[in-house]
Structure formats: structure tokens, C-alpha cells
């Protein structure tokens, strides 16, 4: 029997991001978006719906990934596109309700790890075994 693939909802995305080491959340861009950060650096931006940037709400988040990884994911998945209002080379919009939970979690982890890899060595050390 084939294994059923589950999709994430907005609360599951939020909860998963907050479980990662050192993550904080805030709303610097208004009430319609939550950002998730490591050491003050944004790795994920979760749209809550409505607001001036998302009038026709479609569940999505923007995340930072390596440029070549963004290209690869966009080629393979129609639910991953260049991010709206972000540097399209480095950021992708992920329409998480159209993708498997496993893939969405992997993308969030990858984005989190990318930001950690850019931190100063002394700061990065506290995340190595997390």
C-alpha cells in the first residue's frame, strides 16, 4: 500500500520553525507576516494572509536558500517560485499546502542551516550540535 503524504498547515509551519535551535519570531513588516530569525537574521517569512502584500491569500512562506538550490527546487516543484518582495536569486516562496510535510520541513531546516553557516565562527559554534 502506498504511503499517504500529508501537507502542513500554517500552525504546523510556525511550530516547526520555532523548534529549530535559536529561533525567534517577530512581526517587523506588519500584522500580516511573521518572520523567523537566528541571531537576528531572517531565514523564513510566513505570510498570515490578507494585508497589503497578499490580498488573494495563498498559504506560503518565503525562505532564503542558496541560489543553485532555489533554481533546482523551482524547476522540480510548481509550488516553489521566486519570492515576492525579496531578492529572487536568494529567496523563494514556498506554497506549503501543495507540498509534502517532509519536503517543507527539509526546506525550512535548510534555510535555517544556511543562515547559521553565515554567522561568525564563535557564534556558529553553539549551533553545531543542535
Kindly give the residue locations of the regions a language model identified.
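Charge-dense, helix-prone N-terminal extensions
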Residues: 1-130
Amino acid at each position: 500500500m502506498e504511503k499517504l503524504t500529508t501537507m502542513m498547515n500554517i500552525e504546523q509551519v510556525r511550530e516547526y520553525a520555532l523548534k529549530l535551535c535559536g529561533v525567534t519570531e517577530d512581526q517587523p513588516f506588519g500584522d500580516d507576516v511573521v518572520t523567523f530569525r537566528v541571531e537576528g537574521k531572517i531565514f523564513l517569512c510566513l505570510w498570515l494572509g490578507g494585508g497589503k502584500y497578499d490580498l488573494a491569500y495563498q498559504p506560503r512562506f518565503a525562505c532564503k536558500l542558496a541560489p543553485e538550490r532555489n533554481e533546482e527546487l523551482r524547476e522540480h516543484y510548481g509550488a516553489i517560485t521566486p519570492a515576492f518582495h525579496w531578492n529572487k536569486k536568494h529567496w523563494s516562496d514556498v506554497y506549503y499546502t501543495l507540498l509534502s510535510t517532509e519536503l517543507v520541513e527539509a526546506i525550512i531546516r535548510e534555510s535555517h542551516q544556511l543562515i547559521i553557516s553565515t554567522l561568525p565562527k564563535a557564534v556558529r559554534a553553539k549551533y553545531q550540535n543542535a
